[in-house]
Amino acid sequence: VDDDLTAAAFRRAFRDADGVEPMPLPDGEVVDSLGSDIGPLRDALTHARWLHVTEQDTGGAAATLAAWPSTGVQVDFFFGWGAPIAFDFDLRQLIGDEDVQALARLLRLVSSVVGKDVVVRPEGERDGQPALVVEASTGRCRLLPAPPG
């Protein structure tokens, strides 16, 4: 458990430097992930007993795997997009500290299985500074301060 990883701190990290509320679907990515990382990650997610997982593949469209690390918190992995592995979740679903901790647990699993860092940026800022980083080397999940406005 990361003591500084609270729902309030999470909301602050995703808020713009000028205090504007963020768009609700931040962009997550497994840094430098490859197509060959998708299979092991899919297997780990579907076999984790503490996750509820469903997969959707609509006739050749991009396969999406939805994972619920806690009731009411859904993380969508877009495996059909190929590499790097991309995902998103809805900030509005992270109501309390338990929800944020459950998300962090899921992202640590992702980082551990693939052996690569995981970053989450505010929605639409795919090349911007991450608000959240999970370090593969340590398993540490940390929030980064918003850049100065």
Protein language model features and the residues they cover:
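Acidic (E/D-rich), amphipathic helical modules within compact regulatory domains
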Residues: G39-L65
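Glycine-rich, often proline-containing surface loops adjacent to acidic residues and nearby aromatics
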Residues: D27-G28, G80-L91
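An N-terminal amphipathic alpha-helical segment
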Residues: T58-I85
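Short non-domain terminal segments
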Residues: A8, R12, I85-F87, I95
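Acidic, proline/glycine-rich low-complexity IDRs
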Residues: F89-G149
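Short glycine-rich, low-complexity/disordered patches
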Residues: V20-V31, H52-G60, S112-G128
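Short, extreme N-terminal segment that most often corresponds to the first beta-strand
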Residues: V1-D37, L144-G149
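Short amphipathic alpha-helices in soluble, non-transmembrane regions
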Residues: A8-A17, P40-A48, A102-L106
